[in-house]
């Protein structure tokens, strides 16, 4: 599924590979969909390590970068697990 097909209120995942090795995975919750403007909460991991969380990530679906990315619908629990992983990493830093 392409970025133009994303629906508000749904969860998706994207994966990026280099030489068959998963290097980046993102989980998306689409919070707003208005014409070509898409807003999402996004959790991003690089090589299995939590990297970032975006609470208000904007996507313009004509952007060339996102045109080549394939989205797969996923369950809310997968997004939640990714957020929990980031929280664990942040708590570990506090020590």
Regions found by a protein language model. Give the residues of each.
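Glycine-centered loop/turn motifs
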Residues: 9, 24-25, 57, 84
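Short, exposed beta-strand/loop patches in secreted or surface proteins that constitute
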Residues: 4, 29-32, 72
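SH3/SH3-like beta-barrel fold
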Residues: 40-41
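Short intrinsically disordered terminal tails
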Residues: 1-2, 6, 91-95
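Short beta-strand-centered aromatic/proline hotspots
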Residues: 22-35
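Short coil-to-beta transition motif at edge beta-strands of beta-rich domains
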Residues: 4-18
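Intrinsically disordered, low-complexity, charged/polar segments
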Residues: 47-95
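Acidic surface patches and DE-rich sequence motifs
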Residues: 14, 18, 33, 46, ...
């Amino acid at each position: 599924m392409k970025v133009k097909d994303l629906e508000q209120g749904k969860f998706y995942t994207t994966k990026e590979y280099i030489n068959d090795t998963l290097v980046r995975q993102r989980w998306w919750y689409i919070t707003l969909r208005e014409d070509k403007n898409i807003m999402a909460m996004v959790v991003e991991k690089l090589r299995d390590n939590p990297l970032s969380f975006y609470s208000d990530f904007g996507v313009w679906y004509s952007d060339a970068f996102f045109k080549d990315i394939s989205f797969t619908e996923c369950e809310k629990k997968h997004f939640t697990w990714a957020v929990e992983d980031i929280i664990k990493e942040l708590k570990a830093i506090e020590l």
